Amino acid sequence: WMASDLSRLDLVAIQIDGIHIKEELLLVAAVGIDVEGTKHPLGVIEGATESAATAQALLDNLIGRGLDPSVCRLFIVDGAKALSKAIRRTFGSHTPIQRCQIHKARNITERLPKAMQASVRRTLRQAWELDDAEKAQKLIRNLARRLELDAPGVRDSILEGLDEILTVNRLGLPAELRRSLACTNVIENMNGTVRRVCRNVKHWRDAAM
């Protein structure tokens, strides 16, 4: 499977996400989406952390199997900066990257007092649903300003990576398609399968062995 030919797949988007199997073990997986909306598991690679080197190894594997790096595709990632860095280094600085909105909302609300979580989640969802990326960005910046006094540590988290959070809004995609491509949910099904299989593995060996 990890050596299968990818050259005939007409992929328009690729989702990449890390799967934490054990504290010291992470698998980085990729799923492609073609023009018909069909999902294609592309590859999984083992790494100690979700580092640039691990992400680069996965991308190099995909290219070596026929993925054309000159074709512009949307990449959806879980938010790890190392992934975005490796993608842009490999596919070009203008490659569109969408950071998972669900991961982002979870990271923000988990740092808030419970009484504030629902209202912040609603505001973020309202921003995600906007067709106009500039209006969405303004709404999120206003939220960050409102939280500056009540939860000062959360402000930077809200604003961090804001451009990549709104990529699908900026691309002007239809609402239904935008919701599908704004998060890494497609890959979560594959991640769940990998986790179930890995629970039965008693002794892990290096992938090169």
Question: Which functions belong to the PLM regions below?
Answer:
Residues 130-209:
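Acidic/histidine-rich catalytic cores and adjacent linkers
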Residues 106-141, 147:
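Surface-exposed, charged/polar loop-rich segments
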Residues 72-81, 86-123:
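Conserved beta-strand -> loop -> alpha-helix junction used to position metal-binding or nucleic-acid-contacting
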Residues 4, 8-12, 53, 59-60, ...:
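Conserved phosphate-chemistry cores used by DNA topoisomerases
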Residues 21, 98, 203-207:
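Alpha-helix N-cap/helix-initiation sites
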Residues 9, 24, 52-56, 69, ...:
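Amphipathic alpha-helical transducer elements in NTP-driven molecular machines
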Residues 1-76, 81, 85-86, 90-93:
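RNase H-like nuclease fold core
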Residues 33, 61-65, 86-93, 111, ...:
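Conserved, well-folded catalytic cores of nucleic-acid-processing
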